Regions:
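Terminal targeting signals and extreme-terminal segments of soluble enzymes
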Residues: 3, 13-174
């Protein structure tokens, strides 16, 4: 494969960026403005503050979360790293449920199970945006699903099961 060189006979490869066929985003790709209506998300704690920033749009019953793919979010191929997508999805789904359900709006929702189907890459500079909906809320569990797009193109489908935990600190759910 162009852009890779074999490291050893066991089949491990080393990425060689100088020979890569990947396209590079324009220099201003990660400084493009966030879409109108989005504002910085305050919730999430130190982990999200370090790995974000994430933005939220909340208008009526529409709740969307998003972020711009920065170089620090990318894999060696120049696309959003799957781990960052998983982090985003793990914030998207429970926080969407908080905003769409009075039953659990102030409760911590630790993840029991998170299923992500990666549909397409999200390149450097892309605006990644997601929406999620609660499917069912029981006495102790929340079932929810969502869709994530990159510049409007579906890039991940997510579903999750979350435990209804104790009342959460205010900055964890807002």
């Amino acid at each position: 494969a162009q852009g890779f060189e074999r490291l050893n006979p066991n089949g491990y490869f080393k990425f060689n960026a100088a020979d890569s066929i990947m396209t590079r985003a324009p220099e201003n790709a990660t400084t493009a403005p966030i879409p109108e209506g989005f504002a910085p998300l305050v919730a999430g704690g130190p982990y999200i503050q370090h790995n974000g920033p994430l933005d939220v749009l909340h208008q009526g019953n529409v709740v969307k979360f998003g972020f711009r793919v920065e170089p620090r979010h990318t894999s060696p191929m120049g696309n959003l790293h799957g781990g960052m997508m998983a982090t985003f999805c793990d914030m998207l789904v429970p926080l969407s449920v908080h905003r769409k359900s009075d039953q659990v709006s102030n409760r911590f929702l630790p993840t029991i199970s998170l299923q992500i189907d990666y549909l397409a890459p999200a390149p450097l500079g892309a605006w990644v945006e997601g929406e999620a909906e609660p499917l069912r809320i029981t006495r102790s569990l929340v079932f929810a699903q969502g869709l994530v797009t990159a510049d409007g193109v579906p890039c991940a489908r997510v579903s999750g099961v979350f435990k209804i935990g104790p009342v959460a600190p205010r900055d964890a759910v807002e």
